[in-house]
Structures are given as structure tokens and as C-alpha cells.
Amino acid sequence: MGKKRTKGKTVPIDDSSETLEPMCRHIRKGLEQGNLKKALVNVEWNICQDCKTDNKVKDKAEEETEEKPSVWLCLKCGHQGCGRNSQEQHALKHYLTPRSEPHCLVLSLDNWSVWCYICDNEVQYCSSNQLGQVVDYVRKQASITTPKPAEKDNGNIELENKKLEKESKNEQEREKKENMAKENPPMNSPSQITVKGLSNLGNTCFFNAVMQNLSQTPVLRELLKEVKMSGTIVKIEPPDLALTEPLEINLEPPGPLTLAMSQFLNEMQETKKGIVTPKELFSQVCKKAVRFKGYQQQDSQELLRYLLDGMRAEEHQRVSKGILKAFGNSTEKLDEELKNKVKDYEKKKSIPSFVDRIFGGELTSTIMCDQCRTVSLVHESFLDLSLPVLDDQSGKKSVNDKNLKKTMEDEDQDSEEEKDNDSYIKERSDIPSGTSKHLQKKAKKQAKKQAKNQRRQQKIQGKVLHLNDICTIDHPEDNEYEAEMSLQGEVNIKSNHISQEGVMHKEYCVNQKDLNGQEKMIESVTDNQKPTEEVDMKNINMDNDLEVLTSSPTECTRNLNGAYLTEASNGEVDISNGFKNLNLNAALHPDEINIEILNDSHTPGTKVYEVVNEDPETAFCTLANREVFNTDECSIQHCLYQFTRNEKLRDANKLLCEVCTRRQCNGPKANMKGERKHVYTNAKKQMLISLAPPVLTLHLKRFQQAGFNLRKVNKHIKFPEILDLAPFCTLKCKNVAEENTRVLYSLYGVVEHSGTMRSGHYTAYAKARTANSHLSNLVLHGDIPQDFEMESKGQWFHISDTHVQAVPTTKVLNSQAYLLFYERIL
């Protein structure tokens, strides 16, 4: 009989745990029970030994009023030292002291968790019997040797009496304040607004810095109270015009992430706790994004995006469930007809989430062909703006557009300049280390050619947009000229007189390519960014300035007022036959044309179109002058200027213009074989803000890639306390009064990153202030005031996890900002 094997004994796994932590290999070397038991005899618990010997321990009266740093016990020798969140970091210094054997295992005397400095990770002591016995022994010794309340000396009794006197005085002062508050209307003063520290849950400074700024966003707290109300009834307009009554839905309670966020904001407003532990909120974030689990270095901007996107997804899910319940179907299996109905109601987007109502804005990308001056607009929503930060080296690499020529030398130069962008494609691991230099160079050149061809194909495909991939909105409006199209395709034009501003609409729909003269063709195209982007193609021509807005591309490809569309062999849909009978009165000037094609009353399900003209020169106009910020390269205004600068599309970036392609096919130089050749033209492109968000979040892209390496740009970027966004907004920016030429924002939060990419620390600057009533009315009720409200005064605080300190405004403006939080001044 052989002996039984004991090495292969497995440990039962607890299925209830979400993640299985790896076993630490340093438990045997980091534990010494004999030395630990000797050191714990007659010891003062929860006091740093080094701070005590350095005479840095304060009096007991001061000690009880202030928060103590966390104390960690070395499981090798019993040394007690303050944690890494304190100023001295004696526990970490004790580990770094060179010894023959490592003192790497420490035990927290606050929450009884074990940490290994070598692994830089938490150790589950339940996975090791020896470690579990040591932790249990230390906990028993700590509970036995701590003094009981009855065993107090006279000094402690005197301190308690002083405390009672102070508490009685505080109660009297509170009663006076309550009486004053009853007599006078309640006003939120900055002194009453509290700023509290957040416990570090293990390299979670990136999370704490963002949450400090969100806790100082009063609009978010007010809107979350409205979201949490049970039994909320919301009305959604029907997608079909035949259905006149809106759909009433009853929303369920919000999701777990939203509830955890609301609970966290309420805890931050309580006056009892000095330090808040956001464990529940962080665990909900980790459930949405597993990448934040563990104790690795993370990015605060990514955390903010995952947090906001997660709450927005929960709100959309609430609406979808409410629509299903309204149709009387609560089962998981749905038929196709009901699925299509739910999708149609969801596309209405009449219920924006609270995230979009606070942080949501809109960008408009304007592209104009230099030959036919056709303008197309693409609208994209955003929650924050990521701005480029140019260092001294990248600022010198400027390319002159006039000197660009189609030569092999320029192509090689372009490939060298684009090396940084292709660094993820050309990884070191792709080339074997054992090959010769000649083969390595050959492989690099081949990778460059493939990457360049791939980029060209993506750019060419990116200029065409698939009609069925765009989410659109019905937009019926009263216009100057109405044209009713019957089933035979006849058009009758009626003229009225309205100002030109009445025809420009602020809701955008569509994905219709350019309408030129009597015939037009809609190309099926691909949008590489978002399938739900709303695209507004404003087709402005010098001959017949027309703009087409489609309300439902999927339906218009099937039936356009009785004119069925033909589908080409390559999948493209031609609707030129549907517009052959569309004739305009020659007596009318192009600047006075505005046609609305209404659906026939006898044909249910047909869609609404409108054709509106606009001056192409105003497409690139802004609310205010922007050239002033081109000189100051070290300011946030210059970063916004670079983000919204006017670009020229040349050479490989040329625009595929449908109008010019159509003209060439119909012109004298048309191909005799009937083949249709695409025409690529030079164009101008600019991206501007078309919807100013109530809370503006700016992200400075300091972490950049240089070749195969990653680096951080430590350049100081100046940012003002009052920011005017008007130079970067479109001329017809929404949420801005007509006569206002300023879009002002006030700074209230900064996230700063100090250190390097490998080892850094996030801190926050937050401004405790009174709530902006005009901003609350805009978010809650949609009211846009005519006059500006004065900037709310307050006190700035610097928060580093649990450490909170009041600072002047100059220190805030001199910080190395990574995230900036601005609120709208209305």
C-alpha cells in the first residue's frame, strides 16, 4: 500500500465570490508567529510607533477631533506604522528597509484586511490556515487589551466634561440658527456646504477625484431625486402620425448603479460623517466595467465615461421595460411586430436620460465642397470633450498645405509622420527578434504599406453613409412653400411669406444625399462611428440651393409616395425616379425657395420631407470671434481652437461629392460606356458645438503615444475661472438666446494628475458654493433666461482621498489639470 498523496489537495472554491484572488506566495516568509506574540504584549493599539517616537502624536483632545491615519501591523515583527495615505507612510518605509527576510505582510487595524507589498495586492487570509490563525489571534488580543469605558482616568473624564459643555453650546447655537431659519427664507451658504474626504479602497484615487467633483454638482443631486420617485408616468409621442395620442408608460425604479450614485451623493451631504467610504458605488461600477477591479493604475476620464454611460444605459432600459408593459407584454419572448413597435418608440428619443440633460451636448461637423459648394452636416452627441495638448516637439511639426504635392517623396514623408498613429499596428511582437536587420526593415516597410492602404480604404468608405444605419426623427414644420406629392408624383407649389429664420429648424433628422435640380440619387453608405448618429445633409448649391431632410430612411427606400425604388446590383438604392416630376417655378429666386413635401392623406405610412435653402458662407460662422485664441498656445482656449479648427481635405483625404459626380455623368464629358465614376474634390471641414451642455466637462489628453512608447505631457495649460464658449459654437447654437453672443461657464472642479504614467496620483479641486437657480431651471424645466446670473461665490478645497484642505483660487489655476468641470452661467 502506497502513501496517499497530499500535495494535490484542492481547496474548495466559494461560488458566491465574484472573483477568485490568486494565492500569495510570500505568506510563509512574511509570517513569524513567535516574534509577533512577543511584540503584542502590553502594546498600545492603533498608534504609529514612529510618529510617537518622533513626538508627532498630538494631544488627545486634538486627536479625537481629527481623523487618524490608518495603522498597519507588520506580521513579521509586530511593528505598527501609518499607511501610505498618510504624510509619513511609516508602514511602507518599514517594508522598504533592507533586511535579510522581507517584512511584506501587513494587517490593517481598521478593517482587518491583509496586504502584501511585494504582490501589491490584498491577500485573502481565509485561503491560508496559518494566516487566518494569526489574524484571529491579533483580533482577540486587540479586543482584550483595549481599555473599557469604565476604566478611564481622571484626564479622560475632564476631557469628556469639556466635550459635554461644547455639545451643549453647539445645541444652543443650532437652536438659534433654526429659529433664524424659520424667520428668514432658507439660503444655502458656502459655509454650510461640506466637503468630505473619501476612503481609498486600494489605488482608487482616480475614482475619488472624479466623485469629489460630481458631489459638488447640485443639479445632479436634484435630478436624481426626481429619477428616484416611484410611480413616475412619462408620455412618449407616437412614431406614426396616424396615432395622435401619446403612449403613457410607468417607469420602474432606477437601476443599481443609479441608486448607488444617489445614496453616495446623500452621504456626502450629511454633516455627521467626516470621511465617506464609497464601497457600494465602486462595486457597482466594477460590475459594469470589470477592468476597474483589482488595484491597478487606472484613468479617471475612462472611469467618468463608464460611470455616465452605465447610468444612461440603465435609464434607457427603464424606458424600454415601460414601453413593453404599456403594450401589455411582460414576457421575454416577443414577436417581430411588437419588437418593431418598441424600437419605433425608442427612436423617438422624447425622454432624454438625466445624464444627457446634465452633461449632454452636441457637435456639428460641417463639410463643404470647394467646387459645387454643397454643405453637409453630421451631428454627434457628447458627454465630454477630449482636447489635444501639443507639447513643444509636436508643435514644431506643422505641414504647409500649399507645398503638398502628389509625389513619392511626400508619400514617404506622410508615412513617417503618421508613424505615431500606426504604432498599435506595428507592434514589436510582430517581428521576430532572431531575424536580420534587412528582413526587419523589409517587414516594417510592408507593414507601413498595408497600414497606409487600409487607411485609404477606410477614408474612402468613411465618406459614404448607409441610409438604413441612421436613426432619424420626424420633423413636421410650417414652411414658406409647400409641395404636395400625390401617388403619381405630381408636385404643386404654394407660396407664402415667412422670414428665413423661420425655416431653419433646430431638430435634425436624416441621411439624404444631395438633391440637385430635378434628379437625385441616394447612395447607400457606411458610417464608421455610430449607427445611431443623426445626420443632417444640408445640400446647398449655387444653382438651386436645396436642403433635404428625411424622417425615416428605412421606409423611404421601400415606398416614396407611390414611386417604388430600384435597387442596383451593388446594393445601392436609386430614388431619382421619385423626384423626376419635381419642378420649381423659374420665377422664384433660389434664396426664396422652401418646399415641403407632405404625405398624401390617402396613403398611410408615408413620410415627411422638406427642402430648405441656406447661405453656404454662414455654415462656418461662430457666435464670436475665435482668431484671438490662435496665438496663446498654452491655454484651454487654444486647445478648443485646435479642436474646432477649419481643416482642408486634400489629396488622400478628398471628399466624395455626389453633386459633382452627378454633374459629370450628365455633362458633355460623360463616359460613353455608361460607367459611373466617383468624383473626389477638395473640401473644407470644421467641427463646432451646436448644443451647449449645462455642465461642460473638458478632458486634456496628456497621455500620448510616441512611437512604441507612451508618455505624459507635463505642459501647464492655463484655464480661466470664467470660460466663454461662444467662439467655438455654431451661429445657431441651441440653448442660447437669440440676442446673446456669449456662452459663459464657471469653473467648479478640477482633477489633477501628478507623477508619471507608471506611478501617479489623482487629486481633486472642488468649489463649495450655492446652487445656480437658473441652471436648475434649465435642466429641470428647460427654461432659458434672457439675463445672466452672477457667478456664485464659494470656497475652493483640495482633496486627496481623506485629506481635505481649503486653498486659494490661485493654487487651483496653477494646477496641472487633467479634467475640468464647468457649469453654465445663465
From Swiss-Prot:
It is found in: Nucleus. This is Ubiquitin carboxyl-terminal hydrolase 16. Residues 438-458 have a biased composition (Basic residues). It comes from the Eukaryota. Disulfide bonds: none annotated. Pfam families: UCH (PF00443), zf-UBP (PF02148). The active site is at C205, H761. Zn(2+) 3 binds at C74, C77, H94, H103. The UBP-type zinc finger binds 3 zinc ions that form a pair of cross-braced ring fingers encapsulated within a third zinc finger in the primary structure. It recognizes the C-terminal tail of free ubiquitin. A zinc finger (UBP-type) spans 22-142. Residues 146-190, 394-460 are annotated as: Disordered. GO terms for biological process: cell division; DNA damage response; mitotic nuclear division; monoubiquitinated protein deubiquitination; positive regulation of DNA-templated transcription; positive regulation of ribosome biogenesis; positive regulation of transcription by RNA polymerase II; positive regulation of translational elongation. The modification Phosphothreonine is found at T557. CDD domains: Peptidase_C19K. Residues 196-825 form the USP domain. There is a cross-link at K140 (Glycyl lysine isopeptide (Lys-Gly) (interchain with G-Cter in SUMO2)). Specifically deubiquitinates 'Lys-120' of histone H2A (H2AK119Ub), a specific tag for epigenetic transcriptional repression, thereby acting as a coactivator. Deubiquitination of histone H2A is a prerequisite for subsequent phosphorylation at 'Ser-11' of histone H3 (H3S10ph), and is required for chromosome segregation when cells enter into mitosis. In resting B- and T-lymphocytes, phosphorylation by AURKB leads to enhance its activity, thereby maintaining transcription in resting lymphocytes. Regulates Hox gene expression via histone H2A deubiquitination. Prefers nucleosomal substrates. One of its GO terms (cellular component) is cytoplasm.
